[in-house]
Structures are given as structure tokens and as C-alpha cells.
Amino acid sequence: MNSKILFSYTIIIIGTVMILLGARWMLVDEPWMLDEVANVERLEMTFEELFNSESNKTLPGYLKQIYRFFGYWVITIGLFIISFSTPKLIESNDLRKRLLLCLGFMMLLGTILGHALIPSSHFIYLVWIMNASYLFCIFQHNKINK
């Protein structure tokens, strides 16, 4: 298959994954439970214990609000990724380089923060799959340039 198509579709898949993750955080009633094990480990208490305190009665609503905004931004990033990775647009070498630079920065920092802050999260596995996809894109980019 054509390297440009492989590059483009792989980036589109990364963007689609971002959109799906963002939608999950926006639509789930208790989004903090999507990664319960890592969150409980980080908090060093259960959510039940956290929410039982009188001073934390409004915390679930606040967390829901924060996760909704987070989901919105993840969806927006996914849409940008998809918008700039169509086969026609990625014919531009400069655009491919900028897309790879931005994605690389996002993936590197996401991997570092994930391992540092929530190492037991199941999202770590997804990050590594996305990193492998990103490396595949770099390989395809290099093939296009030859």
C-alpha cells in the first residue's frame, strides 16, 4: 500500500481514538471511575471515603465538570489531528513534519505523565499502542521522503 495512505490512515486512527476517549469522559456519569484503580491508588482512599466527607459533598459535580471539559479538549485535539491528516493534505512534507512534531510532543509528555502519575492505569497500554502507531507514521514519513 502507498506510504502516504498508510501515514494518513494511521494518523486518522490516532485522532479517532482521541475522539472516542474524549467522548467517553464526556458521556459517562462518573468519569473518574473509568480509571478507578489508578485513581484510588493515587488518592490513597476510595471515592466513597472521599465523597462521604461533608466538605466534599459537591466534589462529584465538580469532578464531572472537569472531566467534561477534559473530554471536550481531547475530542477537539482528535478533530484537529484528523483534519490535518487527510491523504491530500499530508502530501505536504512541511505539514507532515509539523503534525509529527505536535503528535510526538503530545505522545511523549502523555507517556511520561502517565507513567509518573498513574502507572497502574489501563490507559498506559493504550498510550503504548498509540506510540507504536506514531513510530509507524515516522517510518512511513521517511519512506515518502525517499
Locate predicted features:
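Cytoplasmic juxtamembrane interface segments
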Residues: 1-15, 63, 133-146
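Juxtamembrane loop-transmembrane helix junctions in multi-pass integral membrane proteins
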Residues: 2-9, 55-61, 65, 90-95, ...
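N-terminal signal-anchor transmembrane alpha helix
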Residues: 6-38
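Hydrophobic alpha-helical transmembrane segments of polytopic
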Residues: 7-17, 70, 77, 99-107, ...
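A loop-to-helix transmembrane entry motif
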Residues: 35-40, 57-76
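Luminal/periplasmic active-site loops of membrane-embedded glycosylation enzymes
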Residues: 41-55
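Juxtamembrane helix-break-helix junctions at the cytosolic face
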Residues: 78-97
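Alpha-helical transmembrane segments of multi-pass integral membrane proteins
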Residues: 105-146
